[in-house]
A protein has these predicted regions:
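Membrane-embedded and juxtamembrane structural elements of multi-pass membrane proteins
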Residues: 1-175
């Protein structure tokens, strides 16, 4: 099960990231030994769930920025809508294609925002972190109703290409 994070350094990193992104409501932070990649779950009470492995402060900053951008953009709401549509229209393959496209778009957009917020110099480290999470095999497979940092090799390849091609557009960004 999930174990609440009590490490003050990690909680301060999360708080700093929430402040940087102007997020008022706190997001719960937990760890789970059964996952190898961070994930955000919950719609009314969102939680970021970290793998139980040791993560450095840079990695945690990237993870928190990524997951909090999903939270701020309400990506969970859109994923839940797709999940509900899939329940009602379970026989329609286009609903599943739409779900994959929504997930892909959310991740690419989120990666872009992370790099723009954290700076151009973080592209390589952020990409390396994504690769490390894809290499780890999760016991829990993600669903459309969750937001994860990684999905698979093909999507990772597309995400890394987009991250590396990203040019600094302007100093102001609306998240």
């Amino acid at each position: 099960g999930n174990k609440e994070v009590s490490d003050i350094k990690i909680l301060n990193l999360l708080s700093d990231c929430e402040e940087k992104l102007n997020i008022k409501a706190g997001v719960e932070l937990c760890q789970n030994a059964l996952i190898n990649s961070p994930i955000m779950i919950g719609f009314f009470r969102p939680s970021i769930i970290l793998p139980a492995k040791e993560l450095g402060s840079k990695e945690l900053s990237y993870i928190f920025a990524h997951e909090l951008i999903h939270y701020k953009r309400r990506d969970m709401f859109y994923k839940w809508l797709i999940e509900i549509a899939a329940c009602v229209h379970w026989f329609n393959p286009f609903v599943y294609l739409l779900g994959k496209e929504v997930n892909r778009t959310c991740e690419l957009s989120c990666d872009e925002a992370v790099v723009l917020i954290l700076g151009d110099k973080t592209k390589r480290e952020y990409g390396d972190m994504l690769i490390s999470f894809v290499r780890a095999d999760n016991q829990y497979k993600s669903s459309l109703a969750s937001v994860t940092l990684t999905e698979g090799a093909e999507q990772l390849k597309e995400r890394l290409g987009a991250i590396m091609e990203l040019k600094k557009k302007s100093k102001s960004i609306k998240v």
